[in-house]
Amino acid sequence: MLLAFAKYLSDNGITPKRRVYVHITVYEEVGHGGSASVPAGVTEGLAIDMGCVGSGLMGSEHKVSICAKDSTGPYSYSMTTKLINAAKESGANYAVDVYPFYGSDVEATLRGGYDLRHGLIGAGVFASHGYERSHKDGVEATLKLLAKYLEV
C-alpha cells in the first residue's frame, strides 16, 4: 500500500507538505521492526499495518482502522485525534479500536529509545496470519486518510 501511495505521488508530481520517510520492515512479527534507523529530527511515527476485524471490534474489511491502544498501551492521544479528524475530513470510512493482543512496529520504535508521537492505522483485514482477506474499500479508505493526514 505504501509503495502504491508513493507511486501515486510520483506519477502526479505531488510533494507532501511535510517531510516523509518510509521505513519498510519484515521484523514486526518478532517485535523489533521499527526499533532502529529512525532519522534525526523525526517527531511522529505512523505504522501502517492491518486493521483487526472480529468479534468485539468496530473495524471491518470496508474501513480503515485507527488503533487507539494495543497490548503495550495507548497510542499518542494528539496523533490519534489528528488521525480521526483526518478520516472525518477526507470522508474515509473508519473505525477506532483497541487491540489487546497486538503490537506494532511503531511501538518498537518507542522501545528502541526514540521520543516521538506515534499512531497506527490499517485497512481492515479478516483472519490475519492465515488466509487473510481484505476489501478494496478498506484500502481506499486507508489511502484517503493517509493523503489527508500527510497534507497531499
What are the functions of these language-model segments?
Residues 64-152:
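Active-site-adjacent substrate-binding region
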Residues 1-70, 106:
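Acidic/histidine-rich catalytic neighborhood of metal-dependent amide-processing enzymes
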